[in-house]
Structures are given as C-alpha cells and as structure tokens.
Design a protein with these regions (language model features):
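Helix-loop "lid/cap" segments that line or gate small-molecule binding pockets
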Residues: 93-101
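Short Gly/Pro-enriched turn/cap motifs at secondary-structure boundaries
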Residues: 113, 128-131, 155-158, 177-178, ...
Length: 386
C-alpha cells in the first residue's frame, strides 16, 4: 500500500501481515476444501489474535477493546482481507452495534464478545427484503412487557454458529411527510431461545468456508430487556454499522487485490512463452499496469473514507463510493489475474480461482453496486431539486 502512514500504523500493518502469513494462509486451502474452519483451528486463531491485541480492536478501551481509530482499523482489515472471511473472522471484531447495550446487556452480551466467549450475528436481510430494508416482513408485536417475534432472516453470515443474534423487526408504523413508514427496532435473541431456530443456509460459491445461516422466529417471545436501544431506533443503530461495513469491505477488497497483483507479477516475470517472460508482452504488461493503477486509486478512496470517519465527517456517499469502486476494482483485477495465469488460474493448486470466486460476492453484500450508485447519484441530484 503506497500511502503515507504513521510509524504506529506501519507497525500495525506489518504485525497483521505477519499474523496472516504465519497463522492464516497455511490453513486456507484446507478450510476451503472442508467447507468450514474446525473448532480447534478457530480457537487457535482467536487466542493468537487476542494475544496480539487484534481481537475487538474496534471497540473502546473502556470495555476492554483495542480502541483503534478507523484509519488503523482500515489498515488492519486490508491485511486480514487477504485471506478468507472464514479465517479472518476469528481474528476480527464484534459489531460496534453492541455499544448501544445498557448496563445489564453489556455484561450479558457486549463484554463476552470482547473477550471472545460469545459471537454475535447481524440479522436484517430477508428472502423478500434485501436492498429494500423497509419491506422487511419480520414483525415484533407488543404484548405487555414482552414482544412476540415472527418472521425469518437469511444470508446471515458468520465464521461460526452465533451465540446470539441482533435481530431487526418492524414494531409499528410512523406517519411521515412521505407517508406511513415502518418503525424498526433491534432485539438481542439468544440461540436456543424458545421460538428461535438457527439452521445452515445453502452453500455459496464465494467464501465457501464462511458460513451463512437462516434464522426463523415462530411466536418467539422476548422481554423488553432484550431490546437494543429504544423502540424505533433500529435503523438509526444499524446506519453507522452499515456505513463502516462498506469501508471495511473496501479495505478487504484492496488487500485481496494486492495479493492478486503480487501473484500475477510473479507469474508474469517467470512464466515463459516464445522464449521470453509473458510480462514482456504488451497484452500482459498493460493488464499489470491497469491493476496497479486501480488498486492505488481504491486504496486512496478507502483511506479517505476512514480518515473522514475519524474526523466525524464521513457521509453515506463516501462509504458508497469506497465500497463501489473497491469491489468493482477487485472484480476486474481477479479476472485479469485469471487471464494472466491462463489455465492454471482456474486450478485449485493456486489461490487465483478462489480469489476470483470470492471477489464476486463483494459486489453484492453490504449493499449491491446498484444500491451504492443510487446513494451516490441521489446525493448529486437532490441538491438540484431532482
């Protein structure tokens, strides 16, 4: 990454890079073929991450986290992003949404996540409500001091089966100048709670060892004490997490793109055809030039967004531009890398084919490329009254 960093940030990047090389990369092919990370492997990664201070680095020191700023977290995510989410999930972070916990909830949910005793999941996507969050069908009906939840969530991603879910459900309707609008609230629901079931989702061609789950709620009764924040605050709570999630996706895409570029450069310098390295052919060398240029541009967008977040100035448009460009950039670089490697680029002996498959998901989750373009264009046109 050819970007000016402080000495502390450079040390962080080097430290995470070593962790990835020594602890994660050697397991990559094994977990890809197994379709999941074993409990033993996951515990070893998590314990090493805790020892090195990476785990929960995004949360404040006041709750036992690392207290890193967003720029440092982007640097960290960029390095961790070079490997499968299935592996780096064990070394990363609980969601910042848990900072909305009250004192009782902190001891039950937040603090165990900080120490690695528990793992949460974020459940907002539904079979009929992906990008259109407000069309969610999951409902929570008030019943005295309880809420009764009915509905389902899918594409709930996690490196392991979660201990509890942060579930978003409609709890009523508000009248707004634009008409009725669903009031969305968040609930903390434990695995095994009556009326709540977690099952494995279908296997995905991308991020094969990164698990996805289906969450089903059938008259699931939870108390007021299980609500995260206040009623109707669900989308407000989720907004910051979603925005920063797009920056983390962008950072991870840059990490994988750098890995693809390095592999392609090495291959182009050593693979010979017609008595010369294929990197000497213009078709290959121009691909490499484009790859390096696009990666640099994406890196700058990611760091720009992260630094604005540190200053409290990041907008939804900043996050959307970051996620859009970086994910589309990774798609192009992955395709170039396969082409440069030829037939070997599609063989499991090399990581190229996995990185190529994994790249496809980045343009879909955390908001599709089309949604990002909608956010960006809306910010451009609305000031003009369009």
């Amino acid at each position: 990454m050819d970007i000016e960093l402080s000495s502390e940030q450079r040390m962080l990047a080097d430290s995470v890079q070593s962790f990835v090389s020594e602890e994660l990369l050697p397991l990559e092919l094994e977990v890809e073929r197994a379709g999941e990370v074993s409990a033993e492997q996951g515990d070893r990664i998590k314990n090493k991450a805790i020892e090195m201070g990476f785990y929960a680095a995004n949360l404040p020191e006041s709750v036992g986290g690392g207290g890193l700023d967003y720029t440092s977290l982007a640097i960290m995510e960029r390095e961790l992003g070079k490997v499968s989410h299935a592996l780096h999930g064990f070394a990363w972070r609980p969601t910042e949404l848990l900072m909305a916990c009250n004192d009782e909830q902190k001891s039950r949910y937040l603090l165990p996540c900080v120490t690695g005793e528990k793992v949460e999941c974020f459940a907002i996507t539904e079979p009929g409500a992906g990008s259109d969050i407000m069309s969610m069908a999951t409902r929570a009906k008030s019943d005295g001091s309880d809420w009764i939840i009915n509905g389902s969530k899918h594409f709930v991603s996690s490196h392991v089966e979660p201990d509890f879910a942060i579930v978003f459900a409609a709890t009523g309707t508000d009248d707004t100048p634009r008409g009725p609008r669903k009031r969305v609230s968040a609930f903390l629901v434990d695995r095994g709670h009556p009326g709540f079931e977690i099952t494995r989702g279908p296997r995905c061609v991308s991020q094969r060892a990164y698990l996805n789950f289906v969450l089903s709620f059938n008259d699931c009764r939870v108390s007021d004490a299980q609500m995260l924040g206040e009623e109707g605050e669900g989308l407000m709570l989720a907004d910051k997490w979603i925005k920063m999630g797009r920056v983390w996706v962008g950072a991870g895409c840059c990490g994988r793109a750098e890995r693809l570029l390095e592999l392609s450069l090495e291959w182009a310098a050593n693979r010979k055809q017609f008595d010369q390295p294929i990197g000497k052919f213009q078709g290959t060398s121009f691909k490499l030039a484009d790859m390096a240029t696009e990666l640099q541009a994406a890196d700058l967008l990611v760091m720009h967004a992260a630094r604005k977040a540190d200053a409290g100035e990041m907008t939804p448009t900043d996050a959307a531009m970051c996620k859009l460009f970086a994910s589309e950039m990774l798609h192009r670089l992955a395709d170039h890398a396969v082409q440069i490697h030829g037939g070997m680029g599609l063989m499991e002996d090399l990581p190229i084919e996995r990185l190529w498959r994994d790249a496809r998901l980045e343009r879909i989750w955390e908001g599709t490329s089309e949604i990002q373009r909608h956010i960006i264009s809306r910010s451009l046109l609305r000031p003009l009254g369009a």
